[in-house]
Regions:
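Membrane-interface starts of transmembrane alpha-helices
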Residues: 1-2, 103-112, 153, 201-204, ...
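Aromatic-anchored segments of alpha-helical transmembrane domains
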Residues: 44-52, 113-123, 163-171
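Functionally important transmembrane alpha-helices
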Residues: 131-195
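Hydrophobic residues within alpha-helical transmembrane segments
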Residues: 78, 111-118, 131, 135, ...
């Protein structure tokens, strides 16, 4: 419903107000190739694998069967597919395409990505935490923008975004200096270094994740 409302709203704006096909905003018919499915899973799995090089322990939380079902469903359907599609529709579809039409592709890739990073700043964050999350958010935004530019559609970046959310922040796996009892599996690091843990924002803004964004962007 969440995705349908957003895509329906975008369709009405494009068709009725702007008189521009959705395809011009890189929002066409969904089409997924095996390569992008592999890439979508490879990025979070690479991050998890690299963390195994650092001292820590795996811990499994004891969750009721119904709680686990709800956790998996929410991770896949909402934080994964829905959030990935909606955020890519807005940032890589509408905003990036509009900026590209107004200026050029380079600005279109960078400007919305920095905005994407800034919007992940949360109340109560320290200054280093803010800097860290803006850098990480901007880089992953640039990665998704490059994927969209290369393929000509938002659907591959939405797939990568969705799988990342599902595995890394959806409640299935948590990596940090302390366990989260609401998450199914925890990898508890022996260090509390903000570079490795991601500081205030978490593993998504860690140097390991940032390195993964850069590797896949190249």
């Amino acid at each position: 419903l969440y995705v349908g409302l957003v895509l329906g709203g975008v369709f009405l704006i494009c068709k009725k107000m702007l008189k521009i096909p959705m395809a011009d905003f890189k929002i066409g018919k969904p089409d997924v190739y095996p390569f992008w499915i592999i890439a979508a899973f490879a990025m979070p799995l690479l991050v998890i694998l690299i963390y195994q090089l650092f001292a820590g322990t795996w811990q499994q939380s004891t969750l009721e069967a119904e709680t686990l079902k709800q956790l998996v469903a929410g991770s896949v359907a909402y934080l994964g597919l829905a959030t990935g599609i909606v955020e890519e529709t807005v940032f890589r579809g509408i905003i990036m395409s509009s900026v590209e039409y107004a200026w050029n592709r380079k600005i279109a890739v960078i400007a919305p990505s920095v905005l994407f990073g800034c919007l992940h700043i949360e109340e109560g964050m320290s200054i280093p935490g803010m800097i860290q999350v803006v850098i990480a958010g901007s880089l992953v935004g640039i990665l998704f923008s490059l994927v969209t530019c290369y393929t000509g559609t938002i659907w591959y970046s939405a797939l990568m975004h969705g799988i990342w959310n599902c595995l890394m922040i959806g409640g299935l796996i948590h990596i940090g200096s302390a366990a989260d009892s609401a998450v199914w599996y925890n990898y508890v690091l022996d260090t509390d270094s903000f570079l490795l843990t991601g500081g205030d924002f978490g593993v998504e803004s860690s140097v390991i994740s940032i390195a993964a964004y850069l590797i896949f962007a190249v």
